Amino acid sequence: MRQIYSFIILIILISNALLSDNGELYDSRHSTLINLNPMNFNTQITNNRNKEIISFIHFYSPDDGKSNQLKDVFIELDNEYSGMFKLAGLNCKKYKDLCAKEGVTEYPTYKIYPPLPAPPMKYEGKIETKYIISYLRKFVGNKVQELNNNNFDEFIHDKPEIPKILLFTNKKSIPLIFMRLSLEFDVSIYLFNIILFHRKKSILVL
C-alpha cells in the first residue's frame, strides 16, 4: 500500500513539473490577469478596442529566462490598476502562431493595444510600474472638464437632474480613475475637475 501511495505521489509531482514547464506564467484563478489563447484573443483584446479599453500584453515563453523575474511587476500592475487597464499574458511556447501573427518573435515582448484607430505598439520602456503607467496614461481618453470662475455657475445650473462629481485637488494632472470614470459615465453623470493649487489635500465630493 505504501508503495502504491508513493507511486501516486511521484506521478503527481511529475505531472506538475510537466505542466509548469509548458504552463501559464500567470494564475488567473487568483487575479484578473487574463491568459490569452487563439480562442479568446479577439474577444478579450481585439473587440474591446472599440470600447475605449487599453490592453497591455506580456508575450512570453516559460523558458525565456526573464519573464519569471518580471512577472511580479505585471501582477502588481493588475492589483493596483485592475479595471482601468486590461492586463494579459500570452504563452508563445504554446501559441507560437498567434504570437507570430501579432508580430512577436522574441520573448519577452510587451505590447500595448490602445483604443482604435491607434495601432498596437511595442512597449520598450522599463518594466517598472511607474514607467508603464506613465506610458499607458497617454492613451486614456478624458472627458473631464476643468471648472473656473467663468463657468462654475453654468455647471451648477446646467441639467440639474444629472448627478455631478467634483474633484478638488492640488495636483496638475487628473487622476487616472477620474479619467476612466469620465468615459464610463459620459452620458449619465457629469465629471468636473476643479484644480486648487493652494490646497494640501485632495478631496473627492460626491
At which residue positions do the language-model features occur?
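N-terminal leader/targeting and pre-domain segments
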Residues: I4, S15-F56, E80-P163, T169, ...
